[in-house]
């Protein structure tokens, strides 16, 4: 196989900021903890060793998620390793694009696999596990409901009214798969793969579950563990962060300060920050939370909470909260975002 390199600054799909980061990382020195270099991981791992994590919780939730799908041998080893103090994870995440959607979806997962393999070789005393997180709480249905195959657009038709996409039913997915088979033709090797996806769709109770099963089938032999974060045990563990954000608007000042510093370097801000960057699940839909005086109102509903009532709601029902579409809470994450050595990369212990 012949592999040719291509200069980052010649790839038009990259933004000005992305190109600058690759070519002149020092420009962003004030915003990153570690340089995107393989040697940086020695420091990252040392730092993460000091961080308290709930390994048992992660192991338990993932074990439950795979109860029906089952685990490949490589996945079993990785899942068991999560309980060990010398295990760390490389995480990448993406919204649940239709049948993986853009090729970038696949690239991100392979980048996590590749990085995990490199780190396992460089640090043989550590166990590095690749993880893919499904961003199923996103509500931007138009962003995930289509794909292009051989220059033909295939669209998933499904009634959508501000529900988190991961919680949608799989109604209409069978029709999507039929269209894919018609384009591929029966003689295509991919035809059998799509037939297996039909079985996955038929046995799935939600779109998130279908995406979980599909990604797992594609990458289980590489040891990738697929995680859907829209789980009550995860949110229960996360409720102190939810309280800080909703009751104290904790992220706003931090993000605004960082955005201002980035703009001073002639780069655009990446997100719009609100006073409250969580939404509330109400009757299957996600609704914004707004503070009016000393009352927390759920937009477009008749629900409202005092400060004490909201605190109790979070404590008793953390699963009713969710991230805004572009979470501003990365400053508080206990996790890692490691898409590849070609993008911002960190390492974390399993949690």
Task: Describe the predicted segments one by one.
Residues 1-351:
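N-terminal targeting/trafficking signals and adjacent low-complexity tails
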């Amino acid at each position: 196989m012949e592999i040719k390199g291509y200069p980052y600054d010649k790839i038009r799909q990259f933004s000005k900021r992305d190109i600058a980061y690759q070519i002149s990382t020092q420009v962003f020195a004030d915003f990153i903890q570690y340089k995107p270099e393989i040697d940086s991981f020695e420091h990252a791992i040392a730092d993460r060793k000091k961080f308290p994590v709930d390994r048992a919780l992660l192991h338990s939730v993932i074990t439950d998620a795979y109860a029906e799908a089952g685990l490949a041998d490589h996945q079993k080893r990785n899942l068991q390793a999560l309980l060990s103090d010398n295990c760390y994870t490389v995480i990448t995440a993406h919204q649940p694009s239709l049948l993986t959607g853009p090729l970038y979806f696949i690239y991100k997962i392979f980048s996590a696999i590749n990085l995990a393999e490199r780190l396992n070789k460089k640090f043989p005393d550590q166990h590095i596990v690749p993880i893919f997180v499904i961003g199923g709480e996103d509500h931007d249905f138009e962003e995930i409901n289509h794909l292009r195959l051989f220059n033909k657009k295939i669209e998933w038709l499904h009634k959508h009214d501000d529900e988190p996409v991961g919680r949608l039913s799989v109604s209409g997915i069978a029709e999507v798969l039929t269209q894919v088979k018609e384009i591929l033709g029966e003689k295509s090797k991919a035809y059998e793969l799509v037939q297996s996806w039909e079985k996955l769709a038929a046995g799935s109770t939600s779109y998130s579950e279908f995406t979980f099963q599909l990604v797992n089938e594609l990458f289980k032999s590489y040891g990738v563990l697929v995680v859907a974060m829209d789980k009550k045990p995860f949110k229960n563990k996360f409720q102190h962060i939810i309280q800080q954000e909703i009751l104290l608007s904790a992220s706003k000042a931090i993000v605004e300060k960082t955005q201002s510093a980035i703009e001073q370097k002639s780069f655009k801000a990446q997100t719009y920050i609100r006073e409250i960057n969580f939404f509330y699940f109400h009757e299957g839909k996600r609704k914004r939370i707004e503070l009016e005086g000393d009352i927390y109102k759920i937009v477009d509903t008749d629900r409202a909470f005092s400060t004490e009532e909201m605190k109790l709601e979070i404590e008793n029902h953390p699963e009713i909260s969710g991230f805004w579409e572009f979470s501003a809470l990365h400053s508080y994450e206990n996790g890692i975002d490691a898409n590849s050595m070609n993008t911002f990369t960190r390492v974390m212990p399993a949690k």
